[in-house]
């Protein structure tokens, strides 16, 4: 379960997220809807600790989430709007790097990488560097990377943007 209490984020004089109280139960699907600039991406960045709140708190299974809680951070994975991957690395290297960040055994990283790249129809492109991938392929790789650690909480910020219709359908 993930819960926020009075979650607020300000940037100078602009309040992007204002006193958000939210409770999402285990197994529940939840969407943030709103126009551009409504604070959806900022909220996701706060929930994943990419940003720190100005005030308020985030609880994972009743425990306060901070950047100093790797045990709780391991439960969360995020797919951001931006292609946040090193452009000079290939797919295998991206997946290896992600797995090592979470102290996964190499054998498990290799097994999950194979499984996920196959699932997303990327296996034959695995040695291409990120800079040589299409937008849709980058997006699929971000999905693979996010699922690698088998997270309990998956935060998605426009995960199928840039994908063709068939890829979007496969993803959902």
Question: Model segments located where?
Answer:
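Conserved ABC transporter NBD signature motif
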Residues: 56-67, 71-72
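Conserved ABC ATPase "signature" region
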Residues: 96, 100, 107-125
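Conserved ABC ATPase signature
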Residues: 129-133
């Amino acid at each position: 379960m993930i819960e926020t209490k009075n979650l607020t984020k300000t940037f100078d004089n602009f309040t992007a997220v204002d006193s958000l109280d939210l409770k999402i139960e285990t197994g529940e699907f939840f969407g943030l809807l709103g126009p551009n600039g409504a604070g959806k991406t900022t909220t996701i960045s706060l929930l994943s600790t990419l940003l720190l709140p100005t005030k308020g708190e985030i609880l994972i299974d009743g425990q306060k989430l901070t950047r100093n809680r790797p045990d709780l951070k391991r439960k969360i994975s995020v797919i951001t709007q931006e292609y946040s991957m090193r452009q000079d690395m290939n797919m295998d290297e991206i997946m290896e790097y992600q797995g090592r960040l979470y102290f996964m055994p190499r054998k498990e990283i290799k097994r999950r990488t194979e499984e996920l790249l196959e699932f997303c129809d990327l296996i034959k492109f695995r040695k291409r560097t990120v800079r040589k991938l299409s937008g849709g392929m980058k997006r699929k790789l971000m999905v693979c990377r996010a699922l690698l650690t088998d997270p309990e909480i998956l935060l998605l910020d426009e995960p199928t943007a840039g994908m063709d219709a068939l890829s979007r359908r496969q993803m959902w």
